[in-house]
Amino acid sequence: MIELKKEIYEKLVSEAEKISDEEIRNVTLNILKEPKITFTKAEPKISLHESPAAPKKHHAYPGGLVEHTWAVLTIAKNLAEIFERTYHVKVNRDLIIAASILHDIFKFYQYEKDPITGGFRPRSDWYLSHQFSIIAELSFRGAPEILIRCLAEMHGSVPTSMIESEIVKFADSVDAKFVSRIQDIIRDSCKDIELLTDGKYIVQKTYPQILMKKTIFELARIYYEKGRDKLTEFIIRELGIKLEE
């Protein structure tokens, strides 16, 4: 699955290369190709490609961060087109692409692998949230003020004054809420397994384990086509769980 996320990453690079403004394009590509915090001494414990978008809330699986970034970019571009056609407003596509790509890019610095559950957890030694890290890094690299402002606004740090900030913020929210709902469906089946095994297989372990083997939407498809019980049975088989007679 990590290989699939690397394919998505290459698509992000391709989109960044389409940015017409040279300064915005260069800083976006430089950070995307080498996502490293340089304004302070800091080292990540996991890579961008393997990172979840969040340990629990949404896209909480390996590669979830890259997948979420691609979804936000795709949604934001389509929203921009809809708003331009419907309301005849001018949307800066360079900002849409750059802000979508960069909005969560340093999240992987915040997380580490969880040796107990097999999933991910927040680092206890990390002191910078991603929304502040990207603003500081862009400022340190001398990025255009309009890009810094767009990202600050879409993260809610300051009042919104740009339509591009609103579009990316909305795209981010839509994708996060949608995938969070799908995750709840899968967690419910994992909770069923915990009850069926009298707590032997707890949800905190079965949930990350099944997402190491199957994509979230492979599992969701089973639920929508066959129902919750069939999804629970599928997870039991995939994880080799033995139910007592």
Across the structure, where does each feature detected by a protein language model lie?
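Acidic/His-rich, divalent-metal-binding segments that scaffold phosphate/diphosphate chemistry
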Residues: M1-F120
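Intrinsic-disorder/low-complexity, polar/charged segments
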Residues: D21, P159-M162, G227
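Divalent metal-dependent catalytic cores for phosphoryl transfer on phosphate-bearing substrates
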Residues: A53-H58, E67-H68, E84-T197
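Terminal helices and disordered tails flanking the catalytic cores of nucleotide-processing hydrolases
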Residues: K200-E245
